[in-house]
Amino acid sequence: MEDLCQYLLVALPVVCFLVWLWRDSQRVPNITEKYVLITGCDSGFGNLLCKRLDRRGFRVLAACMTERGADDVRRAAGPNLRTALLDVTDSASIQKALEWATKEVGDTGLWGLVNNAGRSLPMGPTEWMKPSDFESTLRVNMTGVIAMTLAFLPLLKKGRGRVVNVASVLGRVAANGGGYCISKFAVESFSDCLRRDIHYFGVKVCIIEPGFFKTAVTNLESLERELHRLWNQLTPEVRDSYGEKYLLNYIKVQRFILNLVCDSDLSKVTSCMEHALTASHPRTRYSAGWDAKIGWIPLSYAPAWVVDCALNLVLPRPARSVS
């Protein structure tokens, strides 16, 4: 009896893992008949994803912020890809995109909505921000995701499809001030609530949590320019409490971190998105990038004091620090 128990203790995890692998490998049929709408296709993850899905035979509805971005997508696409201009912060633009998508998909419904559009800046010390600095990011990353999802849910319910929301590892660990981390935490919680509410209608919800990748979101020149703008808008009292050396060291730290961990292989993220759209049993969360898997995600389970200490070791100290 004791030998049997020991055998079961070893065999059960192995069997569970094999079952998980089998379920994870199952794919949905007839992808050439499925419509997927992707936001933020001008560059980065969205641009690569729409081209990859188009090559696989999906009917891609690529939503771009600019005409230039839409032209770039069309030049590299096949005959089944369609483009439209979309500003996720503008309700009229969302309504126009909904009417366009409704005509495109017809009675088929929408198989996938990939909420990829996003912005990261301004990002920096919290005290340097104004409310408008938070709002500009939250309108795209949080309110835009919510507005798009609610608008397209009827089409998704008709197609029994799935919502793929792009969050971030910074939706697990708040490492910077500004609206970015706040918005990505919001995407995580919104997606969890939506998944629990909407599964009754056959709609699945997946969260993509990329680590640091070389995209417009992690552009060093833009980050440094925004940090200088924030610094210049500070009152003399606040500026004096930090000291100009703090600004210079803060920029050095950001430059060092981004150069160290940013991955240029965007396909690590788009592969997760593709799995979420093609798997019969998509995962709830996908972590993309080595820094996410061995760094940020494990750190998110650590006590708050561990995270605080880790970040304090990296970030500079203000000139008039009292602790």
Region locations from a protein language model:
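Substrate-binding pocket helix/loop in short-chain dehydrogenase/reductase
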Residues: 124-126, 133-135
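Residue(s) in the substrate-gating loop at a strand-loop-helix junction
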Residues: 168
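Active-site helix of classical SDR
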Residues: 149, 183-186
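Conserved glycine-rich cofactor-binding loop
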Residues: 35, 42-43
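Conserved NAD(P)H cofactor-binding loop of Rossmann-fold oxidoreductase domains
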Residues: 116-122
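SDR active-site lid
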Residues: 200-283
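The beta1-alpha1 cofactor-binding region of Rossmann-like NAD(H)/NADP(H)-dependent oxidoreductases
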Residues: 86-99, 131
